[in-house]
Amino acid sequence: MAKHLGKKIAPIPMSTDISVVDLIDNYFTAYNSARLREASQLLACDILKDGVTVGVSLSGAMTPAGFGVSALAPLIRNGFIDWMISTGANLYHDMHYGLGFELFAGNPFLDDVKLREEGTIRIYDIIFGYDVLLETDAFIRKILQAEPFQKRMGTAEFHYLLGKYVREVEKQLGVKHSCLLATAYEYGVPIYTSSPGDSSIGMNVAALALEGSQLILDPAIDVNETAAIAYNAREGEGKSAAVILGGGSPKNFLLQTQPQIHEVLGLEERGHDFFVQFTDARPDTGGLSGATPAEAVSWGKIDPDELPSTIVCYTDSTIALPLVTAYVLNQCPPRPLKRLYDRREELYDKLRTDYLAAKDKPVEKVATNGEVATYPCGTPIRQ
């Protein structure tokens, strides 16, 4: 039994002046509280170091609850998030705060028919006026008519421009705490969305297309830029971390950077070094949201040698994010900003150059003199 023993569970009564670090380190002793503790400590001790590139995926209705302003923006300011994948809905509802609109605590058991008649929108226990949607839509359509948007672009550039305009509104209105989009713009953190048409932002882009807008959001740009970020993360002694809030398409878009590198582009890559997920999704239904780090190893998304550095905490992200944010803000000094948005073209060109060079090599290595035949990425071909 001795080899399985961890830290002894020695409970002591809580004090009236307990800190969040003390709470997590000493009272989150088992089950998913222990997983949250392990995730917090892994972030503080290993992930949030200068040589690690941290990608965060965001799904679920997190920004309507204010977490874009209260948690994600501070993490960006401290250099703890280098790039992001988000649902479009999270970025859309984040804009409400930047534009000075109001959202309120409500009740999940309100009469939704009456709410519709009153012009009130409900997101579980959050409520706000229908006019918030209309005014946000009007703002989006107005700025998307500007010249910088009249071209083909990826979603990182698109969100950077959105954040720029939202930040100007924040300044004019005197908004005290910037929203996620505006903060990412200021700190050079690229934000991608894996499904740009699947939100009110994309719906407004589509409406303007009917009017002749030249804006085209190109998913190929996003796939290659995100792969380039992951590819560059391993330069020198660097490492790559995937921190996943929820699951869904953003989770896959963050993790698929590795198969894009080795499976599709034929470049050598071993997977992300760190994997931390907060989710309420089960693994046994086969969906990506609940897929475990061990399963991701089979796809080449996670380095098998780094499985001990992977943690899944089964909990609501609205519980985990504020706790973990408070923990790392207390435990970790700010990191230098990577400003990966400003380096997109440089990283893209490096990936493209290496890919084209690899393409000139034989499609697969033929085994001779006892050698093992391999695929272009170096994976052995099993007979």
Curated annotation (Swiss-Prot):
Coiled coil: none
GO cellular component: cytoplasm
Pfam families: DS
First-level EC class: transferase
Gene3D superfamilies in alphabetical order: Deoxyhypusine synthase
Protein family per UniProt: Belongs to the deoxyhypusine synthase family.
Name of the protein described by the UniProt record: Deoxyhypusine synthase-like protein
Organism of provenance: Nostoc sp. (strain PCC 7120 / SAG 25.82 / UTEX 2576)
